[in-house]
Amino acid sequence: MSASREKNKRKEQAAVPETANEAKKGMSKGLKTTLIAVCTVLVVCIVVFFYMLTSGFFASHTTAATVSGHNLSPAMVNYFYKNAYSTMQEQYGDFMSYILDTNSPLDEQTYDADTGETWADFFTQQGLTTAAEVYAIADEAKANGYTLSEKEQAAIESQLTSLDLYAAYSNMNRNSYIAAVYGTGCSEKSFREYLEVTTLASSYAQSINSGFTYTDAEIAAEYEANPNSYDAVTYRQFLVSDSLFQTSTDSSDESTADSSDESTADSSDTTEELSEEELTALKEEMASTMAADTAHDEQAFINAAYENAQDSAKESYADESYTLKEDQLYSSLSSDVADWLFDASRTEGDTTYIANDSGVYYVLYYISRSTNDYLLPNVRHILISVSDTSDETAMEEARAKADEILAEFNAGDKTAESFGELAKENTGDSNGDKGGLYENIMPGQMVTEFNDWCFDESRQPGDTGIVETSYGVHVMYFDGFGNSYRDTLVENALRTADYNAWHDGVVGDNAYTTVPFGMKFTTK
C-alpha cells in the first residue's frame, strides 16, 4: 500500500467518530427537548388531576347516576345517601347501633350475606330510589306551574344560614362545613339545589294529597261497602306460647351448694327439654280449655289468664285491664284474628283460640264492635318545652309559666281566639301560627297524657287544663268537636288510594342508573 493511500485511509477512519459524535449530539438535543416537553405536560396533567381529585371537581362535575332524566353529580348522590342514613337513624334511634356499627365504614359492613351487598350499597339504593321519586314529582310540579311559596323559600334560606353557626364552631366557612358533613365536592350551591328540589317535591305532593275531596254520599257508600275497614272491636286476649311450659330446674346438688369452693357452689339452671310435638299438644290443650271454660264469662277469662300466666308476669295480669284490647281496627290485627273478631255473626262472650305461624296460640274473648261514629276533638294547646323532664327544677319553672299563661287567659274574655293569640306568643310547638290548634285528633295520635285529656268523656268546649308529658307542660283548651271519626277514617282511606294512584302514575318504578366512574367520587 502506498504512503498516500495509507494516509487517506487514516483520514477516513479519523472522520468516522466525528460524524458519529455530530449525529449523536444532534439526536440528543432534539430528544431532550421532546422529553422535557412531554415531562412538563405530564407533570402539569398530574398536578391538575390531583387538584381536581382533592378539590372535589370530579364530585361536582361528573355524573354518578341518572334519575328521572336528570344527571346527578356524586355530590348530589351524597345528599340523598346521607338522607337515607339519617331517616333510618331517626327511625331506630339508639337501637341503630344494634343493627350496624355506626363507628365503622359502611362499605366494610355486610348488609346481605347472600349478595355481598354492604350497608353503603343499601343506603345508596335507598337514596337513589328517593331521588328518582323526588325529581319525578318536582318535574310534575314545574310542568303544572307550581312553585315554592315565600315561606318555603325563607325556610331554605334559614336552614342554610343555620349552618354558619356550626361552621363557625368548627372554624370553617359554609362551603367547607357542607363538604365536611356530606362529602368532598359538596357545596352551598349543590346543597341549595338539593333543598329546593326536595322541598318543591314535598310541597307539591302535599298539595295534591290535600286537594282530594269527597262528598258525604261518596263517604257513606265506601263505608257501606267495606265496614270492616272502618269499625273497631274490643276484646280480651291471652297468648299461649312455648315459654309457659319451658321450666327451669336446679341441677346443683345440695351437698355441693354448701361448699366454699365457688366452682361448685354456683348452681346451674337447665331447661326441661320438650319435643315440638309435646309443646304443641300442651299449648293447644291450654288454649282450647281456656276458650271453652270462659265462654260468655268475662271474669272467668280474666281469672284464667292470671292462673295460666308465668309467675314473673302475674303482677301484670293482676291488673284486669292487662288482657283488654280496646277499639282495635281490622288493619292493626293479624288476618286470622281480625277475620274472627269482625265476623258479622260475632256476639258478646264468644271465645276461640287461633294459632299463628310461630306456634303462638291466641285465646280470644269478644266483647263488642263499634262503628266509630263519634266526633273527634279539636284542641288548642300552649307547650312550655322542657328538654329533660326528669329535671325537676326545669319542670317547676315550666309549671309556673303554664300557671301564669292560664291565669292571663282566665283574666281575659276566655275565647278560643284569645287562647290562640297566647299560643302564638308563648308556645314551643311548631303550630303556633295556627293558634296552637289541632283539629280532628285521632285516638292515639298524641302522647298518652295529652290523648287522655282530649278524649275524656266529660270534656266540653271551653274546658282548660294543664297536662304534663315527655315534651314538657301543656296549657290546654278544648275547642270543640270536629268530624266523625268514621268519616275521617273513610276519607283518609279514599285519599290514600287516590294519592297512591297519582303517585304511581307520576313516579313509575323509581328507576335509576349509576355511572361507575362517577360513583367512585361519592362519599360513603
Predicted regions and their residues:
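N-terminal targeting/tethering segments
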Residues: 56-189
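Surface-exposed intrinsically disordered loops and tails
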Residues: 102-113, 314-322, 326-335, 339-344, ...
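Sec/Tat-exported extracytoplasmic proteins
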Residues: 81-84, 88, 131, 135, ...
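PPIase-associated folding chaperone regions across multiple families
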Residues: 8, 12-60, 177-280, 328-400, ...
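Short, solvent-exposed loop/turn elements at domain surfaces
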Residues: 73-74, 86-95, 245-249, 389-392, ...
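Membrane-embedded alpha-helical bundles of multi-pass transporters/translocases
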Residues: 2-5
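Peptidyl-prolyl cis-trans isomerase
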Residues: 284-336, 404-448, 479-480
